[in-house]
């Protein structure tokens, strides 16, 4: 096996299909399967671009592919086992085509490393999230019959070593502005799989944003494991996320900006103000709190209290009263009592969420919480999850029902399942269905909401 760094010198799954960048003799087929967060979606796009320069054209199914790449997530329990199960399902394809190349990327690749190849010898390549710019060099080794492994945290900026993206775009795009996390929440593997917080330069981000707009993008979502910790070099100084958003808002043709995911402790005054004074910044915010009990928040190493979080939400809503708030919650964290869980329910009642995601705690190897006593039983955690989800679903339903009769601006992205139907996103990130022509794709149109459904809204063009 070759470790490339030593020889080179240089969120549910989403399947992504891209039009490849221009390259001669595109004869090889690449299938990418993406698990986990939006950043993995962005990373998959860039990996496909990097391999496009090696003659790979992306396809929508693994059958008939010359290379299959699994871009993995390590946040939830059994993520590694799910990956191994998927690799097992690929065995018949390798048996049918011995020349098929199989690679594993992402956070499970970072965490498991060489163990992946030991357990599944059919894997040719393992690459971490900080080194996928080295994929072309790794493929040289693979094509020579070697195994290739690279899970370094290199000093060089991977974004400087990737080809310029040339794929045709839809009207929305992700743009990674920051990677890694320094918060070290007791339950989280991100600091170990993504590394320390690193911000990209403002100049390069502005250039990439302009390029996206030139290729048809009207809405950009800025990504980071802790995106509001962004502090990138710009104009001889340092830009925070608010400055970056305001400067991007000046780009002609960029109508909408979002960002995710944030930590409450990095919600600076200027970023709060931007929610009120920057119309291009959409009234949607994903701001996880994880728990409502101060005891559990301290055990999680969140470094804020429930009251701190509630005051912060009040300030943001003062700046943007129509804000659609989203959050994350973990139930069954070690040491959580029924009283602690009730504090979480109380916080949800106090704050009110338009959307939220809740999970049972799952011990991640190598994290402080995994070694703690007081683990909550599976039955109790499941019961708490059901009760929390019932409350959050009630709030989401009420928020969606309140949209009926209102007019919203929808950026249309794609046709719906039914003929003559188009689907887009409102300012509040609601999925909105209308009857309309395909020419709506990429356009922003006013829609009056007529009906609220489980996870979407329907309306009519105004």
Swiss-Prot record:
It is found in: Cytoplasm. One of its GO terms (molecular function) is metal ion binding. Binds 2 [4Fe-4S] clusters. One cluster is coordinated with 3 cysteines and an exchangeable S-adenosyl-L-methionine. Residues 28-144 form the MTTase N-terminal domain. Keywords: 4Fe-4S, Cytoplasm, Iron, Iron-sulfur, Metal-binding, S-adenosyl-L-methionine, Transferase, tRNA processing. PROSITE patterns: MTTASE_N, MTTASE_RADICAL, RADICAL_SAM, TRAM. Its cofactor is [4Fe-4S] cluster. It is an enzyme of class 2 (transferase). Catalyzes the methylthiolation of N6-(dimethylallyl)adenosine (i(6)A), leading to the formation of 2-methylthio-N6-(dimethylallyl)adenosine (ms(2)i(6)A) at position 37 in tRNAs that read codons beginning with uridine. This is tRNA-2-methylthio-N(6)-dimethylallyladenosine synthase. The lineage of its organism: Bacteria, Pseudomonadati, Pseudomonadota, Alphaproteobacteria, Rhodobacterales. The gene is miaB.
């Amino acid at each position: 096996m070759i470790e490339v760094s030593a020889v080179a010198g240089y969120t549910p799954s989403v399947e992504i299909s891209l039009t490849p960048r221009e390259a001669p003799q595109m004869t090889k087929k690449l299938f990418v399967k993406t698990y986990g967060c939006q950043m993995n979606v962005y990373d998959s796009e860039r990996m496909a671009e990097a391999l496009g320069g090696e003659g790979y054209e992306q396809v929508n199914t693994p059958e008939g592919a010359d290379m299959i790449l699994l871009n993995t997530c390590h946040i939830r329990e059994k993520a590694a086992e799910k990956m191994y199960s998927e690799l097992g399902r690929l065995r018949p394809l390798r048996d049918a085509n011995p020349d098929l190349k199989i690679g594993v990327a992402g956070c499970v690749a970072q965490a498991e490393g060489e163990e992946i190849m030991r357990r599944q010898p059919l894997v040719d390549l393992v690459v971490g999230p900080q080194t996928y710019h080295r994929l072309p060099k790794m493929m040289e080794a693979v094509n020579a019959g070697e195994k290739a492994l690279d899970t370094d945290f290199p000093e060089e900026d991977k974004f400087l070593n990737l080809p310029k993206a040339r794929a045709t775009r839809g009207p929305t795009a992700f743009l990674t502005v920051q990677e890694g996390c320094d918060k070290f929440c007791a339950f989280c593997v991100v600091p170990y799989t993504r590394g320390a917080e690193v911000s990209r330069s403002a100049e390069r981000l502005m250039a990439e944003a302009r390029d996206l707009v030139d290729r048809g993008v009207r809405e950009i979502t800025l990504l980071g494991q802790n995106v509001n910790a962004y502090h990138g070099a710009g104009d001889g100084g340092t830009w925070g996320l608010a400055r970056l958003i305001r400067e991007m808002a000046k780009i002609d043709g960029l109508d909408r900006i979002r960002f995710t995911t944030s930590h409450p402790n990095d919600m600076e005054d200027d970023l709060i103000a931007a929610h009120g004074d920057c119309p291009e910044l959409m009234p949607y915010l994903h701001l996880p709190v994880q728990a409502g009990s101060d005891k559990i928040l301290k055990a999680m190493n969140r470094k804020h209290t429930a009251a701190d979080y509630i005051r912060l939400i009040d300030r943001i809503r003062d700046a943007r009263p129509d804000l659609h708030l989203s959050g994350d919650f973990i139930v069954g964290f070690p040491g959580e009592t029924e009283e602690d869980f009730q504090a979480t329910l109380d916080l949800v009642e106090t704050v009110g969420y338009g959307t939220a995601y809740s999970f049972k705690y799952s011990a991640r190897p190598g994290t402080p919480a995994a070694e703690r006593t007081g683990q909550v039983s599976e039955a109790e955690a499941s019961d708490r999850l059901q009760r929390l989800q019932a409350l959050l679903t009630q709030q989401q339903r009420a928020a969606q029902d309140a949209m009926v009769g209102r007019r919203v601006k929808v950026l249309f992205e794609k046709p719906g399942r039914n003929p003559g139907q188009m689907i887009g996103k409102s300012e509040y990130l609601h999925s909105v269905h209308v009857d309309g022509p395909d020419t709506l794709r990429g356009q922003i149109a006013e829609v009056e909401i007529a009906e609220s459904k489980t996870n979407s809204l329907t309306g009519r063009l105004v």
